[in-house]
Swiss-Prot record:
Organism: Helonias bullata (Swamp pink)
HAMAP family from the UniProt entry: MatK
Compartments where found: Plastid, Chloroplast
Keyword presence, Chloroplast: yes
Family, as annotated: Belongs to the intron maturase 2 family. MatK subfamily.
Disulfide linkage: none
UniProt GO MF annotations: RNA binding
InterPro entries, per the entry: Domain_X (IPR024937), Maturase_MatK (IPR002866), Maturase_MatK_N (IPR024942)
Lineage of the organism: Eukaryota, Viridiplantae, Streptophyta, Embryophyta, Tracheophyta
Any one Gene Ontology BP term: tRNA processing
Protein name (database record): Maturase K
Role this protein plays: Usually encoded in the trnK tRNA gene intron. Probably assists in splicing its own and other chloroplast group II introns.
Length: 515
């Protein structure tokens, strides 16, 4: 606890006190809406609203001018339900401006975290490589580790029971009272916050609006709860993690710390010896985490009970036991990062001969396996209006007004992205089915536009349409083997490939509804 208190005292000197005036600076909104910006340390650049760069500067100037007016922010947010600005009935909508402010606030709120993380990265001399950000790099790690483990905890991250908890977590970094009040306004006035906090689906399904702000809050919140896991690991193994980062809330912390001291003295030393496991691995992506162990079922069950009780009673996080599932790797599979993963057991017999004696030795090998969840993926395609619920391709009427090249390019890009991300699947047949759905949906969309039949359209555009749906690795194979057809390509290309340039899950794979 002395080490923890020393960390808190040292960290207070880095708190930011004057962030609110930055909301009146035009360059802040340029950073928030720069689609090519790679400076964000938490997430990728994204499209917020569809407007061109020429009009965006005009919008920002109008916004800053009105923000200088007294109580404008309060009026604009409260007036968002009426969809108009104060004094402007037919001009820009209040909802649009308040969304711009929230995105600018998110950029400002990132500053304290970036000031803390960037120096630590420089001290550790982490090379500036895009490959370090690839989420596909997690799967080779799982291949290497999970085949030697027995159980896995499949965890859905608990969510806070009150919005004020999110504000308090940010108070560890932001002491600017006006900024915190503005954050409370956004959380309580927007209609979509409830789906973000109390959704029955996985918590990483964020609201479509104010993504940057909500993701900042979510990352801060998850860092708070993960500190508990890091602390337990330190106490049980007496090892100092070198790659962990923890953000702790300071407000009301000393109320919690009294309970923490009691637990440490009266409970930790007696129970942590039951949690010693040198083969324990924890991996999280967005709202899903897995905790894998080589220990027994009793040990992993203790971890589950311990985490649930500690989250609920000492950190005031609402976590229900059914959000944590215990799976034996040899008998069950688990869903993580768009794949259904499992550990396959392959028994085999080895013939050995020593002198004149011949005998058989039964051996068992374990292999980490990943496959594409085809049924949920078809469900995502159905929601996006590419096919029916049964998986029958249909046309996309909303794209029928585009040019032929734009339609083919859009379908081809979706197909290539899905193929690129799911290239690590050990069973390619389900992936080929998805590509078939997208290709035929593209053909039916073009046929709908030209009022023709799919057969006639495919005869006219088959070669060009097929090339658009080739992935990079398939194009390389076709260059090496010019006589390779599509069907022989499907049969020969069955190896799993993990790419080091994938920094996010495809939107269709990310929207899978798994309970």
């Amino acid at each position: 606890m002395e080490e923890l208190q020393g960390y808190l005292e040292k960290d207070r000197s880095r708190q930011q006190h004057f962030l609110y005036p930055l909301l009146f600076q035009e360059y802040i909104y340029t950073l928030a809406y720069d689609h090519g910006l790679n400076g964000s340390i938490f997430y990728e650049p994204m499209e917020i609203l569809s407007y061109d760069n020429k009009s965006s500067s005009v919008l920002v100037k109008h916004l800053i001018t009105r923000m200088y007016q007294q109580n404008y922010l309060i009026y604009s947010i409260n007036d968002s339900s009426q969809n108009r600005f104060v004094g402007h009935n037919n001009y820009f909508y209040s909802h649009f401006y308040s969304q711009m402010v929230s995105e600018g606030f998110a950029v400002i709120a990132e500053i304290p975290f970036s000031m803390r993380l960037v120096p630590s990265f420089e001290e550790k001399e982490i090379p500036k490589s895009q490959n370090l950000r690839s989420i596909h790099s997690i799967f080779p790690f799982l291949e290497d580790k999970l085949s030697h483990l027995n159980y896995v905890l499949d965890i859905l991250i608990p969510y806070p029971i009150h919005l004020e908890i999110l504000v308090q977590i940010l108070q560890c970094r932001i002491q600017d009272v006006p900024s915190l009040h503005l954050l409370r306004l956004f959380l309580h006035e927007y209609h979509n916050w409830r789906s973000f906090i109390t959704s029955n689906k996985s918590i990483y399904v964020f609201s479509k609006e104010n993504k940057r702000l909500f993701r900042l809050l979510y990352n801060s919140y998850v860092s708070e709860y993960e500190f508990l896991f890091i602390y337990i690991r330190k106490q049980s193994y007496n090892l100092r993690p070198t790659s962990s980062r923890a953000f702790l809330e300071r407000i009301h912390f000393y109320v919690k710390i009294e309970h923490f001291i009691i637990v440490c003295h009266n409970y930790f030393q007696k129970t942590l010896r039951f949690f010693k496991d040198s083969f324990m691995h924890y991996i999280r992506y967005q709202g899903k985490a897995i905790l894998a162990s080589r220990g027994t079922y009793l040990l992993i069950k203790k971890w589950k009970c311990y985490l649930v009780n500690f989250w609920q009673y000492y950190l005031y996080f609402w976590s229900k036991p059914y959000r944590i599932h215990i799976n034996q790797l040899s008998n069950y599979s688990f869903y993580f990062m768009g794949y259904i993963s499992s550990v396959l057991i392959n028994p085999s017999a080895v013939k050995n001969q020593m002198l004149e004696n011949l005998f058989l030795v039964d051996t068992v090998t374990k292999k980490f396996d990943t496959i594409v969840p085809v049924i949920p993926l078809i469900g995502s395609l159905s929601k996006a209006k590419f096919c029916t619920v049964a998986g029958h391709p249909i046309s996309k009427p909303v794209w029928a007004d585009l040019s032929d090249s734009d339609i083919i390019e859009r379908f081809g890009r979706i197909c290539r992205n899905l193929s690129h991300y799911h290239s690590g699947s050990s069973k390619k047949q389900s992936l080929y089915r998805i590509k078939y759905i997208l290709r035929l949906s593209c053909a039916r969309t073009l046929a709908r536009k030209h009022k023709s039949t799919v057969r006639n359209l495919l005869q006219r555009l088959d070669s060009g349409l097929l090339e658009e749906f080739f992935t990079e690795e398939e194009q390389v194979i076709c260059l090496i083997l010019p006589k390779t057809t599509l069907f022989t390509l499907h049969g020969s290309h069955g190896e799993r490939i993990w790419y080091l340039d994938i920094i996010r899950i495809d939107d269709l794979a990310n929207s899978l509804d798994w309970s």
